[in-house]
Every structure is written in structure tokens, then in C-alpha cells.
Amino acid sequence: MKIILVGSGKVGTALARQLSEEGHNVTVVDTNKARVEHLIETYDVLGIVGNGSSITTLSEAGIEDADVFIAVTGSDELNLLCCMFAKKAGHCHAIARVRNPSYSHELDFIKKQIGISAIINPEMAAAKEISHLLRFPGASKIDTFAGGRVRLIKFALTEAQGLDGVAIREIPSRLKSDILVCAVERDGGVIIPNGNFVLQNGDQVTFLATQENAHAFFQQIHMPVRPVRNALIVGGGAIAFYLSQELMDNHVRVRIVERDAARAQELAEQLPGAQVLNEDGSNRDFLLSEGLESAESFVALTNIDEENVLLTLFAKKHSHGKLVTKVNRLEFDDILAGLDLGSVVYPKYMTCDYIVQYVRALQNEAGSNIKTLYRILDDRVEALEFTVHEESAATGVPLSQLHLKKNLLLCCITRGDRILIPRGGDQIQVGDNVIVVTLEHGLHDLRDILDKGAEG
């Protein structure tokens, strides 16, 4: 597909890399000459130095025959303007990143009036993810499928869970838990396990289950399941605003620490149910005086990654509450993986994942389309949900007879109101949603899960 990408910041760079690696013809547009030249030299993309809201620049980029137009500059208004001009000048799908909370209640109106195909608000998405984690504090990561009915949950295995030396196939009968272990991180590597795989203390385990079955499983292995009742948030940006709204709607007591007096006053007016403290959140004595040791959750949301990391490490030393850390710079994820920071949230990953998911779905106008895509475990694993629109080599055949690719696990089938953890005798049918976890990147269609070389 021909894609025009306006904006070459962190998200734009991640998109240029991912989309070009998947074989798309990507043209990057930005006013920053150095950034454009860097992307041209680093990835297989074209580049134009210019304003993405200029019809002349858009024409030079080939807007007339573009399939997708993506605007991820640092300005919401510029992103919307670029998309509006792109829709007028071409016949493409337009995607905009819009971050300002003042637009949050107007997104549907904006999409309809301008004709934008999709709008992504990374701060709102991050707030929703953090809210899920605080409602299920035993998990370090939660992704949702099937409209929220199915969850992919990650946790750290310790001696307290009593699963050291247990084979995965023994878990359902041993714990009476209908869950499926999908991936295990061990010694720096990632394994897509089979039933004979034996768990060890220290493993980072990712499993799939319904919310009810996940809750029951965590109870069986002595993991915390009660939602937090209070939250101490350091940093009063957009994520803190959205998160506070989510938490207060669920009757969680919220305290926000914001060092900027004007912003603290603004938050106090916008969030009358929250306690807003105009203080320096990096002041350790202040945090202790505000009850850090008894807080059920601590969320570091400042604009400085290093400060968030240090704050979380300090909170870990003094609190047994749920810890959540926001990180913006994607290149630090391998370093952070070695630190015990609780749950780490990457808003920029969410933006990139959403847009890549949308582009992949557009490629498959017929057949089995991607409905949901997550890149998990430090971008080493993809979890995908496909909608089955037509019969293929993957449908109507017992799963035990399908020749699946290596390092791929078919985890779940949703059929109407039914959620199936599949067994060998189950079959994929037209109308199903199918969830797979794989080490292979770039799957576009359900048929891609089959090992063509192994078919007889």
C-alpha cells in the first residue's frame, strides 16, 4: 500500500520502521530536514521536507493515489488540518493523532465532519490501560480482546504461587482453572510453550483467560485480585487527567501531585473529586508524609522518563502497593526490562500498534481480517485477533490436523457469546474470532498461521 506519513518524531519514526518493514511504500513528510534525511538513510522510505498541510507538498508526496494518510505531528490542530486537506486532495483513509483532552468529547463529531477514518488519543488509551491494571493489581500487563471479554495477562512467577516445576498441561486439572499459558519469558528469551513445558520461579508468564477465569486463577495461586481503593499519582498531565476520571468513576480515592501551580489549579477545577497537591513529586520526604507507605497504588506520570523510573524504585522500597510507570522513549525498553518497576506503560507503543493494526486490516478487504493487534513482551511477540469472513484451509478442520507455523499458538476462539479455549477436536468456523500468539511478525490473515511447507 502507498502510505504518506506526516511527522517524524518518536511515533513517526516507529511507524516508518514498522510499515516499511511490512513492505509498504512509505513517504515521510516533515519540516525538519535532518529527521527526514535520517529516516531515508535508516529505513526503506521516501522523504519530503515540507509542511504536511500544504497542498503543494501533499501533491509532491503523491496524495492523489495514496491509500493511507497518517498525521502524527506534535500539534493536534495540524494533524486534523493535514487530514482534512488529504481527504480533499485524495481518496485515502486518513488517521490522526489527537491528544488534547478538550477534544475528547468531540472526536466522533470531528471524524464525521472531516471524514477522518480513525483518531487515536494515546494518553486516553494509556489511562485506560493503567485503570485496568489498578483493578487487577496482580497483573503486570493486561491486553484485551473480544470486546474486553478475553484478556491476555502477564505476571511474575515466584515461590508464593506454588507453580515451580509444574507442566503447563497440569494447570487446568490441578487448579481447576480454564486458562491457557501463551508465552513465557526466561533468561532473556521468549518461549511459546507446549503442554509439556515446565514453569520455573522467575518466569514472566503470559496467559489468556476470561476475566472471571483469570480472577479465579489468581486466587488459586495467591495473587492479589482486589481492585485498589486509592491511588497516589505523581505528574498532572493528560494521562493523569483521564486516569483520575476513570478511577473516580470506580470509586477510587485519587491524589495527584503536580509541581506547576497553574496546572495544579486547573486540575483541581477539572477534577473536583480528586485531591490535587501543588508540590514537587520528587521530594521523597513529601511523598512519605503523604502516606506513600500505605498507598495501595503509586503511578509515576511525569514528563521525564528518568524521574518516573527513580520515583517508582523509591516507591517500591517504601510501599507494597501496585506500581505503574510511564515511559515515553521506546529505545529504553530493553534496559527497563531488567528493573522491577511493576507495570510499565508506553503511550507511544499504543499509537503505533493501533495504526499498524488499522493498516493491516485495510489490506484484507476480503477474507480473514485482523481485528486487534498487540505487540507484547518488549515487541518480541505479536498477539492478534482475526475475524473469519470466509472458508479457507484453516476452517472446518480439527485443530489437531492443522499444520501451524512454529512458535505460534492458537489461544482462543470466540463464537457469538461463547469463548473457547481450543482443544484438538475444535474447528474454526466462518464468523469466529480467533486469537493467536506468535514470535513471527507481520501476519496479515488467518491463513498466514499455516505452515505451507508442512501441508501435505
Model feature map: region roles:
Residues 1-456:
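Cytosolic regulatory regions of ion transport systems
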